[in-house]
């Protein structure tokens, strides 16, 4: 297993000052700063070598070519294809004067390119679309910029797809935390199985550039890959997996067969592998996930979101006498468009932070701030609720006070 950080000039030369790689993609929090482009192989074993500087050459892994180097691209059928660019996303890409090509798609590499590559037309993806399928029309620059993040990279988000039609929890697939990956045009993100060798490799690079790996034995070590072109179009490919890749419940190819590149859309459902032994153990469950592309999952705060959050803060201030701006569990700020849980005692937290406390003794809940016990299943028509409302009849109208304070802050005068 090796991780190669690719220089912007041939290895035997000192990189020029203007390398064409954005300095914002340097990650100094690592002992060895990571710069794009980067490349990882998940399948080829490293070969011991006395000269550690030549390991990437002697073990047959190779490195990604520099922008000016002549490159050899191994196509899906194992033959050299000189008509495609240096960032071919369906094969191992190596320098012709550095390392031999590995003629198998199972040695497919994970590589991430930076944004704004020079001579973009020379770095076109090696895309093989299914019959009767064509690429979408090219988009204008304003639309293209909206698809990018602030660094000029495209993004993809994977979240677990909970199959509500399944009667068994075991058949709902493997649960995982949301995964977000970012990549420049021409990049390829490997999908595979999590192993110790993978762990060692990805520990050297930032999370957003990791391969997409899962702890499930029904997924091949190199199961498939995502590709992204210069228009922000994302593609899915099965790379000879044994248990299959499914897009919207349709298998892409038969076992141990490389599939075509299928264009992805927001909301598509992907399944990796099939349950083994009934999926009774998590390690034998398939992975079902929904995809969201190019920041489409991000919510923009509007006036309603901001006003709702302001009401929550004012409610806490009026009921507890304290102004709470941060989540007391994670100590981060509570912001608009975030999922928030508000307890009957008016304390609030990020739902992600308090979820375990909510489900631990549900429906009983003890506030971690004031230690108040409450019943989350109490109905609005219960006697205790009615008594609570009657006791508060003589109390000032908290809601009116909140409205007054919000409008005063906004410079608006209430008129009866």
UniProtKB/Swiss-Prot annotation:
Result of changing residue 350 to A: Decreases the interaction with CDC123
Residue stretches spanning the membrane: none
Classification via InterPro entries: Dma1/Dma2_RING-H2, FHA_dom, SMAD_FHA_dom_sf, Znf_RING, Znf_RING/FYVE/PHD
Induction of synthesis: Protein levels are regulated by nutrient status, being high under good nutrient conditions.
Catalytic EC class: transferase
Cross-link entry Glycyl lysine isopeptide (Lys-Gly) (interchain with G-Cter in ubiquitin), positions: 150, 204, 217, 237, 240, 260, 300, 306, 313, 317
Location, primary (coarse class): cytoplasm
EC number of this enzyme: 2.3.2.27
Region (Disordered): 1-30
Domain of life of the source: Eukaryota
Lineage: Eukaryota, Fungi, Dikarya, Ascomycota, Saccharomycotina
Name of the protein in question: E3 ubiquitin-protein ligase DMA1
Pfam family, one: FHA
SMART domains tied to this protein: FHA
């Amino acid at each position: 297993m090796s991780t190669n950080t690719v220089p912007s000039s041939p290895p035997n030369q000192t990189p020029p000052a203007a390398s064409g790689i954005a300095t914002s993609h340097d990650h100094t929090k690592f002992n060895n700063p990571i710069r794009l482009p980067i490349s990882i192989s998940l399948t080829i074993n490293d070969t011991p070598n006395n000269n550690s500087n030549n390991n990437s050459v002697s073990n047959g892994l190779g490195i990604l070519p520099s922008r000016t180097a002549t490159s050899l691209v191994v196509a899906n059928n194992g033959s050299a294809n000189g008509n495609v660019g240096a960032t071919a996303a369906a094969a191992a890409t190596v320098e012709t004067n550095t390392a031999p090509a590995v003629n198998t798609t199972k040695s497919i590499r994970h590589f991430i390119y930076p944004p704004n590559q020079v001579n973009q037309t020379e770095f076109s993806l090696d895309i093989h679309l299914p019959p009767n399928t064509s690429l979408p029309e090219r988009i204008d620059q304003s639309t293209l910029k909206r698809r990018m993040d602030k660094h000029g990279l495209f993004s993809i988000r994977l979240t677990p797809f909970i199959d509500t039609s399944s009667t068994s929890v075991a058949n709902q697939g493997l649960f995982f935390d949301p995964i977000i990956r970012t990549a420049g045009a021409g990049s390829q993100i490997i999908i595979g199985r999590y192993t110790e060798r993978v762990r060692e490799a990805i520990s050297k690079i930032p999370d957003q550039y990791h391969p997409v790996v899962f702890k499930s034995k029904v997924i091949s070590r190199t199961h498939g890959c995502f590709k992204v072109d210069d228009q922000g179009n994302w593609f899915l490919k099965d790379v000879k997996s044994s248990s299959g890749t499914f897009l919207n419940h349709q298998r892409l190819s038969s076992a141990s067969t490389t599939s075509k590149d299928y264009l992805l859309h927001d909301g598509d459902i992907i399944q990796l592998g099939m349950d083994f032994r009934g999926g009774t153990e998590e390690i034998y469950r398939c992975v079902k996930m929904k995809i969201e592309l190019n920041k489409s999952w991000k919510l923009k705060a509007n006036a309603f979101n901001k006003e709702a959050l302001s009401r929550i803060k004012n409610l806490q201030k009026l009921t507890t006498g304290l102004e709470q701006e941060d989540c007391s569990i994670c100590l981060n700020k509570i912001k608009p468009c975030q999922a928030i849980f508000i307890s009957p005692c008016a304390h609030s937290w990020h739902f992600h932070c308090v979820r375990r406390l909510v489900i631990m003794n549900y429906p009983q809940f003890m506030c971690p701030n004031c230690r108040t016990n409450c019943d989350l299943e109490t109905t609005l028509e219960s006697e205790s609720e009615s008594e609570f409302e009657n006791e508060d009849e003589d109390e000032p109208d908290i809601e009116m006070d909140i409205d007054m304070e919000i409008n005063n802050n906004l410079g608006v005068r209430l008129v009866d």
